[in-house]
Amino acid sequence: MLATIDPIALRLGPISIHWYAICIVSGLLLAVYLAQRLAPEKGINPEHILDFILLAFPIAIVGARLYYVIFQWSYYSQNPSEIFAIWNGGIAIYGGLIAGAAVLYWFAKRHAIAVLDFLDIAAPGVMIAQSIGRWGNFVNQEAYGKAVSQLNYLPEIIRQQMFINGSYRVPTFLYESLWNLVGFSIILGLRYFNKGLRQGDVTSFYLIWYGLGRFVIEGMRTDSLMFVGLRVSQWVSISIIILGAVLLYFRKQRQKADYKMKN
């Protein structure tokens, strides 16, 4: 039987580099690379992408941590010294997305960039970054599901890491990682095979796809807050699914109106 993975990947004297941080930074770098490659298609200066990331990333991390702490307040109110111990894990993707979206809106308006264009080039990278980032949860043994008798369909290294508190746990991190990877692949396929994508289509797909997957997978977890019969993140998922559907509908209606005006 394999030992569990040490959350610390590398120690350099007093400095410890965690796998969690490596996963987040790796996803971020890939997201930046993709967005910079896509930016010229929308007439956006690729340098704006790096400027945006340097501003948005720390704010998104704070938002993700704040979201997590708020919904785990019963624990952190008793352990206030751990509120800032982000290296131990404990950030909520939705908190980061909300904070990041707010910064994106402000940044786009400041630089006279269409918000939907900015979102369209950001969405593919965000999705693959989320896929990679979930492996940080894997190493930290968090964001898992209910106890099960066995996980024989998985490689030994994943089975062992999902043996938590005396039981195997449903690897919800893996399900979400794969779901996001599939979504990323679909976006690439849509971009390659469908040259008629409208402004906002990629953003709508991201919101609906990610929201659906997160809603289902969140229902398998056992470590998140309940509210009116559902987990808080499931309510947020419903909200972003509706947002994506509404955006898709109104963009379609606008396209029809533009077509009638031209004819």
UniProtKB/Swiss-Prot annotation:
GO biological process, alphabetically ordered: lipoprotein biosynthetic process
Homology family: Belongs to the Lgt family.
One Gene Ontology CC term in the entry: plasma membrane
Record-given protein name: Phosphatidylglycerol--prolipoprotein diacylglyceryl transferase
Entry's Gene Ontology molecular function annotations: phosphatidylglycerol-prolipoprotein diacylglyceryl transferase activity
EC number: 2.5.1.145
Membrane protein topology class: Multi-pass membrane protein
